[in-house]
Amino acid sequence: MSYLVLARKWRPQSFDDLVGQEHVSRTLGNAIAQDRVAHAFLFTGVRGVGKTTSARILAKALNCLSSDGPTASPCLVCAACKEIAAGVDVDVQEIDGASHTGVDDVRRIQESLPYRPARDRHKILIVDEVHMLSGNAWNAFLKTLEEPPAHVKFIFATTEVHKVPITILSRCQRFDFKMISAQRIAERVRYILGEEKIVADEAAVQLVAREAAGSMRDALSILDQCIAFGGASLVGDEVARVLGVADRAALHALASAVVEGHADQALSQIDALARGGFDLGHVARDLLRRFRDLAVARVVPEPEPLLDLADAELADVKTLAARTNPDDLARIFTGLSKMLDDIATAGTPRHTLEIACVRLARRPPLLPIDDLLARLESLERRLGPGGGGGGGGARPGGENPGGDRKSVV
């Protein structure tokens, strides 16, 4: 039997399983309970956050055969629920908008809509990547979408909602799917690892959650890759190696060198990372994120909820942050942000990263405002009320018996 990837094996089958989209689950569940289900829905959001999954769950909720009508909690065991989950229900069509872009495709779909469902309660059309439809295809859809048969429901999903015509948007209930927080992704990853009987340290879990960038599907794809490498045990350093992410200790050493002004150590760390085969563009992004974490740890009394870090890494960040000035961290962050823009167009990312780290490590110190005010007051006292140092200014006729004037810096 072929292997079923984690993203498919652990795909949510009910609204209760859906992670990070409670606003969608609650709204749809209440609409079903109150018998206020619209005829057309538009799900929008970045990849891997649950749009198509939610469309299938909604289809099961509307067509579940174990209840007398639509239910917010489908049974998952009746023929309709099983066939919808497998994508073989004859009354639930799931098509890819990228491969059905023309008017003829839409017309073929429309021809089947007036007929009653073969078995289910509703005939449901799920169109993924719906923004790929042509303008003429959308125009052909308009009338049907505005006044569909009572037994027909449309569910559209897209990652680029700005490409969907406003005339279509106005005919649909729109749901915006949020990016999933690293904390929620980490919770789900821990649960799946437990069910799969795989041991992983906290650094590995946090790294997977962080690299997923808000996408649960990406997180499970990354996890599959890491399990293939590490087997039944995952360690943070090994996960970092698989993903091409800089080792946490090396990244912390680089950040410390920049903060403490050791340009030579910063260059040595960059050289070690380059020799290790790490993507220095990725290293630069991780370094920028590290200084964000340092700033948060410096200004927030209890920063743990805002930092997706393992305990050991969190302790290192808090220790380094305690030795820095918030304004200094902001200055370094600004410099690194500009460096990322430069790396995007640079032919040699390593050189750009090296020079940026040297410049930031050799930054002039920030003087406290009290020291600046004290220096200004001292200068004013020396110059005196007449601005000439207590009568020592130039005499009429341009004479200056005191020799060369002293310049004030």
What are the language-model segments listed below?
Residues 51, 403-407:
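Short, compositionally biased segments
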